[in-house]
């Protein structure tokens, strides 16, 4: 086990006099919309029941995830209430980001390649 505390050399001091390493660039977890994240986690739970746990971790092309996200968003905007389309859209977009970050081989946006070829 690595027993190392990373240090940027920058400090922030609290009213109490305590100091910590600056958090800039590390992400602000305190700014996340937790009620929405809980909704997404329940959508993950339901998906695990249908497809098995960690099915999406095997890899889904980003084009499929973005297509589904756009379709769900269009249905949400059109007023469809047969399922939570806004939630489903968010889930698909989050997993597209996850594929980009952890499975770059799943990133397949042919329309981007087509545009780049024309420039």
Regions found by a protein language model. Name each.
Residues 1-119:
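Intrinsically disordered, low-complexity regulatory regions
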């Amino acid at each position: 086990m690595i027993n190392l505390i990373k240090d940027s050399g920058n400090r922030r001091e609290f009213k109490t006099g305590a100091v910590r390493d600056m958090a800039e660039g590390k992400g602000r977890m305190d700014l996340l919309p937790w009620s929405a994240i809980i909704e997404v986690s329940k959508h993950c739970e339901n998906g695990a029941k249908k497809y098995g746990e960690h099915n999406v971790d095997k890899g889904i092309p980003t084009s499929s995830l973005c297509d589904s996200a756009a379709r769900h968003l269009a249905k949400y905007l059109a007023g469809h209430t047969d399922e939570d389309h806004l939630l489903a859209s968010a889930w698909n977009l989050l997993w597209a980001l996850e594929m980009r970050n952890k499975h770059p081989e799943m990133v397949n946006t042919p329309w981007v390649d087509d545009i780049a070829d024309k420039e």
